[in-house]
From Swiss-Prot:
InterPro entries: UDP_glucos_trans, UDP_glycos_trans_CS. It is an enzyme of class 2 (transferase). Its EC number is 2.4.1.-. This is UDP-glycosyltransferase 86A2. PROSITE patterns: UDPGT (PS00375). GO terms for molecular function: UDP-glucosyltransferase activity. Gene3D superfamilies: Glycogen Phosphorylase B (3.40.50.2000). Keywords: Glycosyltransferase, Transferase. Belongs to the UDP-glycosyltransferase family. The keyword Glycosyltransferase applies. SUPFAM superfamilies: UDP-Glycosyltransferase/glycogen phosphorylase.
Amino acid sequence: MADVRNPTKNHHGHHHLHALLIPYPFQGHVNPFVHLAIKLASQGITVTFVNTHYIHHQITNGSDGDIFAGVRSESGLDIRYATVSDGLPVGFDRSLNHDTYQSSLLHVFYAHVEELVASLVGGDGGVNVMIADTFFVWPSVVARKFGLVCVSFWTEAALVFSLYYHMDLLRIHGHFGAQETRSDLIDYIPGVAAINPKDTASYLQETDTSSVVHQIIFKAFEDVKKVDFVLCNTIQQFEDKTIKALNTKIPFYAIGPIIPFNNQTGSVTTSLWSESDCTQWLNTKPKSSVLYISFGSYAHVTKKDLVEIAHGILLSKVNFVWVVRPDIVSSDETNPLPEGFETEAGDRGIVIPWCCQMTVLSHESVGGFLTHCGWNSILETIWCEVPVLCFPLLTDQVTNRKLVVDDWEIGINLCEDKSDFGRDEVGRNINRLMCGVSKEKIGRVKMSLEGAVRNSGSSSEMNLGLFIDGLLSKVGLSNGKA
């Protein structure tokens, strides 16, 4: 049963648009959706934001609160909040049982969403726009059933979207879906420079494409071809040719970076884990002397790799803050770090379960970021001008590494061969990064990122305006208005 919190009367704003936002229920998707909700509400659009019961329970620690209550009372923005079942009990271990969770999202979640949408459409001020995560397989079907404008929000790079969008071309050319895939360059995707197959998303490199995640990707990218608009958390200056090529197929708007680069989202809690505040510890360290380490909210690291990285950190002798999620190896692996690691590190480092990443990255003592290369992390580290040490684990992270190291030159690889690396290589590359490699170039890339949102007539603000104009036109037509 859906739970809808609707504490404010609808004051529309001048747009008469009411958008339902539905993120894929993972931390890295919820975060940009929250920031998008505030961005749209700031334009006068009424927003109803949907979390699953599980995500809501994790964020609120089991309370019955509305995560937007604070920002709504401070700003007056018309953001409502609803929760819906993902088809599994709240207490089910989604990290340990990843495939079961994804299967529920593929086969069961749709029915709960449809029930919620049915309760929110119709009448004056009802929902008339649905903005759903691209990884859902049903948005165009639900939108068509209820007469909604359908928008897909892609929370990753446009390059990754384009490679998935053109899976048919990859199949035809033998670069995907074959027992023996080709290893030569992929040079036929519109708007995409020649790319090595090893730099495509991990799911595009696998020969067995029968997994539940592959089923989701296949169906989602069939569905996205039927939506009205696509929003993308990137900027025009980063991926201009790719975006222009996609625009010949579907209205595709780069409106990034959608990250918490100011305090407007400070009152919205989005973290699935309790955050540790390490500001006081960071205050004791010299400028640019601390390596921040985090492998994100979703992917797992093998115990073997984690041990080598830990010893490499000790060998490097650098100061560090290391986020070690409780389930970083597995939910049933309670102590993944080598015995005596924290004792040997002493005051040089702290290990924490989770933190506010932007708070750490923006601290002047932080001079490097060892990351899994999740897209949110890449945008945030560019914004904070912190060079990157790349250790991609899966999915789009592999392609993001290419952008960071090969194209933009704002970081280096932790290791050259992820299947065979050791602590000595880790220690050497940590020291290379902390000696200032890539610092100058990341400053230039930051200027592009900042320019996309801060300057008058900037690309992302202009694209957002074009998107809203498109929504008004679609809603006006469907409502019989001029």
